[in-house]
Amino acid sequence: MATLKDIAAYANVSSSTVSRVLNNDHTLSVSEVTRERILHAAKELQYTPVKIRKGMANGKDIEAPQIGIIFAQSLEEELVDPFFSSIRHGIESECAEKEIFTVKSFRLKGMKQEELLQDLDGVIVVGRVSPETVQEVSNHLDTIVFINHKADEDLYDSVMIDFEKATKHALNHLFDLGYKRIGYIGGTEREHYINGSSIIEDQRQTVFERVMHEKGLLDSEKVYIGEYSMTEGYELMAQAIKQGNLPQAFFIASDAMAIGAMRALQQSNIKVPEDVAIVSFDDVDVAAFASTPLTTVKVYTEEMGRQAVKMLVDRLSGRSIPLKVMVPTKLIYRESCGALLKKQ
């Protein structure tokens, strides 16, 4: 029997693209030629969705589950922040491998739950959402997995990363290298609801300020906050340069912002790491190829997406106890932190 991988190979596209096209995912940007090629391949290979075992729930085979994905972020936010697009890719890849092709994607803003959620067996919610939104979704569905959102652990599954541990690891590395005057560049964290969003604390900023304060090193004037984008990273570093008395190092809360920040430094003939060291967050693909390769906290975002799918399928197969998966992070050492200079 043909699989999504077979169709992907036949049509020369990825399995996740096949899954989204076959499910009529209108959030996917793909040419009509590619879409037709995938549909033709599915027809030629006589593809039909596979079945999964319901498990101990009733012992019967059922058609592949109807799974929904709710993205708290707008499309614009996802495009400028690879953190969320990588999570999406992990979800889609795991669904493709499990032959779950009935995946529906929604944006939270303006979503009508009654119309969109009624035919679903379960849903994955990506991003921070308000308690009211959690309640509204749970009114229509029992099976919900949250990614990067701390929901009620007694009720819901969640996939998280330990921002506190990761931030402390990055800062301790800078301390070990002898840096004391450390600045921060980061974005605003938002809690989303159907008709908008509100700004809430960002754990990276909170932990940074607490650790620096405890060491008597916090300079609030060297904390720069904007939006999570390359452009904002550039603008905030330009602001820091104009302000003068640059810190010895910066902890920057995303690689995209760090790349923008390094561009601003380069234009002012300020060298990284000779003049200013940088440690950032995410380890996106381009981090290793930046003008100065970035030392950065690697977040296994794709694995977060994969784990969420596994947990959802496990729930649909009969597991009743809610679980919380904490995906680890890892500091990736490259040139921007100045470690090599310290050794010379």
Predicted segments, located by residue:
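N-terminal helix-turn-helix DNA-binding module of bacterial transcription factors
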Residues: 1-58
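Alpha-helical recognition/docking segments in bacterial nutrient-uptake
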Residues: 2, 59-172, 176, 241-242, ...
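Short beta-strand segments enriched in small/hydrophobic residues
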Residues: 19, 57-77, 181-194
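Structural signal for hydrophobic
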Residues: 67, 144, 182, 275-276, ...
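Periplasmic-binding protein-like
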Residues: 68, 119-126, 183-186, 223, ...
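Hinge/beta->alpha junction and helix N-cap segments in small-molecule ligand-binding domains
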Residues: 74-85, 106-111, 159-169, 185-236, ...
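Flexible loop/turn connectors
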Residues: 238-344
